[in-house]
């Protein structure tokens, strides 16, 4: 989860988030090199007092500063296209979960079992000081780790956005439309998210909490909830 004065990205908890962090670092390094090079050239031009009276045109340098940006864009575009493909790639999901956004809470449905499991998830009351303020909920979303998960996201009233940063997932919840996101959690723990689309007066008060457990505990939770 996000912490006070943290300027970095959240720790990765899924393969998708790892790839997003790698692409961020890759692009940032290219931008840093471009910034340093341009700053160096500008400083040299500013402090250099010599003038070349015969330099009226330079075909070579014009070719260079046309080709180099094109090559730079290719180095950014290829990893970006690969990542876009990975984000939309649909593996063979073991579990399908439906997420429905409301003003101002989330509803969840597990449809792969004998009895459909459905519940609402509201923000915990502020007088519960043992929990994180504005982030904890009364019913957590339980999911197994190391399992391919498909989430179908929609809304019942206005546009919401189901976002969990540590997993690298962000999907719009649009009324009358189903959006799909695939992910896999690679470690146990609690992962916090929030609605990322302004949806009304209480937009800031509809958090998301995913609890990642091993498959055995997940099956036990399914049995207990069904009974």
Swiss-Prot record:
**Which EC class is this protein assigned?**
translocase
* Binding-site positions, Cu cation A2: 195, 197, 199, 203
Q: Which residues lie on this side of the membrane: Mitochondrial intermembrane?
A: 1-26, 83-227
Question: Do the record's keywords include Mitochondrion?
Answer: yes
Q: Where does the UniProt annotation place the signal sequence?
A: none
EC assignment: the record states 7.1.1.9
- PROSITE patterns per record: COX2, COX2_CUA, COX2_TM
A GO molecular function assigned to this protein is: cytochrome-c oxidase activity
Give the UniProt subcellular location, in the record's own words: Mitochondrion inner membrane
CDD domains, per database record: CcO_II_C
The cysteines covalently paired via disulfide bonds are: none
Q: Which reaction does it catalyse?
A: 4 Fe(II)-[cytochrome c] + O2 + 8 H(+)(in) = 4 Fe(III)-[cytochrome c] + 2 H2O + 4 H(+)(out)
The cofactors it requires, by name, are: Cu cation
Principal subcellular localization: mitochondrion
UniProt GO cellular component terms: mitochondrial inner membrane
> Which Pfam families does the record associate with it?
COX2 (PF00116), COX2_TM (PF02790)
Give ranges for the Mitochondrial matrix compartment: 49-62
Membrane topology recorded in Swiss-Prot or TrEMBL: Multi-pass membrane protein
Keyword field? Copper, Electron transport, Magnesium, Membrane, Metal-binding, Mitochondrion, Mitochondrion inner membrane, Respiratory chain, Translocase, Transmembrane, Transmembrane helix, Transport
One biological-process term from Gene Ontology? ATP synthesis coupled electron transport
Which ranges does the record mark as transmembrane? 27-48, 63-82
Q: How is the cofactor bound?
A: Binds a dinuclear copper A center per subunit.
Question: Subunit comment for this entry?
Answer: Component of the cytochrome c oxidase (complex IV, CIV), a multisubunit enzyme composed of a catalytic core of 3 subunits and several supernumerary subunits. The complex exists as a monomer or a dimer and forms supercomplexes (SCs) in the inner mitochondrial membrane with ubiquinol-cytochrome c oxidoreductase (cytochrome b-c1 complex, complex III, CIII).
Reported function: Component of the cytochrome c oxidase, the last enzyme in the mitochondrial electron transport chain which drives oxidative phosphorylation. The respiratory chain contains 3 multisubunit complexes succinate dehydrogenase (complex II, CII), ubiquinol-cytochrome c oxidoreductase (cytochrome b-c1 complex, complex III, CIII) and cytochrome c oxidase (complex IV, CIV), that cooperate to transfer electrons derived from NADH and succinate to molecular oxygen, creating an electrochemical gradient over the inner membrane that drives transmembrane transport and the ATP synthase.
The entry assigns this protein to a family as follows:
Belongs to the cytochrome c oxidase subunit 2 family.
This chain belongs to the protein called Cytochrome c oxidase subunit 2
Question: Species name for this entry?
Answer: Acheta domesticus (House cricket)
Encoding gene per record: COII
